[in-house]
């Protein structure tokens, strides 16, 4: 099993996303259910760290990122096989230009 770690940036992006969903849907339950879905998907990486896709941008591929797709959101991460750690660097909306958000 791999340890899952999120950077401060990823935590902030995730928090902002959940606040936005709660505000937009006028339902905290909708936001919390989506957070649960995202976190479950990220936790599955502890057992299947290579299950993410290859990013479409070459610069991200060259830097060793993988991407986990959850509905309209992307979680960018790297796998450290030596230390058995998956580090999540960013959680972004797939519809925005995200190269500079990671």
Language-model features: locations:
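PIN-domain endoribonuclease scaffold, especially VapC-family toxins
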Residues: 5, 33-42, 62, 67-69
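Enriched for short, Lys/Arg-rich terminal
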Residues: 25, 70-74, 78-102
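Arg/Lys-rich, positively charged N-terminal/basic patches that mediate binding to nucleic acids
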Residues: 1-37
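Basic/aromatic recognition patch in beta-strand/loop cores that engages polyanionic ligands
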Residues: 52-81
């Amino acid at each position: 099993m791999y340890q899952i770690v999120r950077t401060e940036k990823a935590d902030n992006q995730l928090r902002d996303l959940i606040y936005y969903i709660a505000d937009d849907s006028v339902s905290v339950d909708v936001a919390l259910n989506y957070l649960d879905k995202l976190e479950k998907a990220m936790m599955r990486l502890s057992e299947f760290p290579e299950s993410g896709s290859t990013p479409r941008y070459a610069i991200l591929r060259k830097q060793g990122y993988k991407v986990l797709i959850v509905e309209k959101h992307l979680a960018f991460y790297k796998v450290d096989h030596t230390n058995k750690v998956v580090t999540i660097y960013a959680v972004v909306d797939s519809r925005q230009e995200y190269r500079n958000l990671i």
